[in-house]
Amino acid sequence: MKKFRTLLVACALVLGASSFVNAQSKVAHIASQELVEAMPAFKAAKSEIEKLNKTYEAEIRNMVLELQNTMKKYQAEAPSKTEEENAKRAQEVQATEKSIGDYRQNALQDLQKKEVELLKPIYESARVSIQKVAKAQGFQYVLDSTTGLGVILAEGKDLMADVKKDLGI
C-alpha cells in the first residue's frame, strides 16, 4: 500500500509537471524595425519622401534668395526714398519673411502627412505577416527586439527569416 501511494504521488507529480510545461507560453522575437527597413516598399516610400523634401527645400531656398535680393535692393535704394516708402518696404519684407516661415511649416506638416500615408500600410503589412508566421508556428507571444524597445535578452526563436520569406524579401 505504501508503494502504491508513492507510485500515485510520483505519477501525480509527473503529470502535473508535464501539464505545467505544456501550459507555458511559446515566445518568439523579431526586430520589427529591421524587418520594415528590409522591405522594398519601405525603401521606395523613403525615396519618395526624400524627393518631396528636396523639392520643398529648393522652393524655400529660392524664396529666401529672392527675399535677400529684394532686401539688398531696398537697402541700396533706402537713402533716395522717403521714410514712408522705407517703412512700407520694411513691412513688405516682414510679411515675406512670415510667408516663408508659414510655407516652411506647411511643408513640414505635408511631409509628415505623406510619411504617415506611405509608411502606415507598410508597418501594417509587416504586423500582419508577423502574426501569420507566429500563429503558424504556434507562438502566443512575439516580442519586438528592436533596440531600445525593452527586450533585454532575445534567445528564443527569431522569426525574422520566416517573416521575410512570407513577405517575399
Segments (PLM) and residue ranges:
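Bacterial N-terminal signal peptides that target proteins for export
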Residues: 1-8
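Hydrophobic alpha-helical targeting segments used for export or membrane insertion
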Residues: 9, 13-15
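Sec/Tat signal peptide C-region and signal peptidase I cleavage site
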Residues: 18-23
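Amphipathic, charged alpha-helical segments and their helix-to-coil junctions
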Residues: 24-169
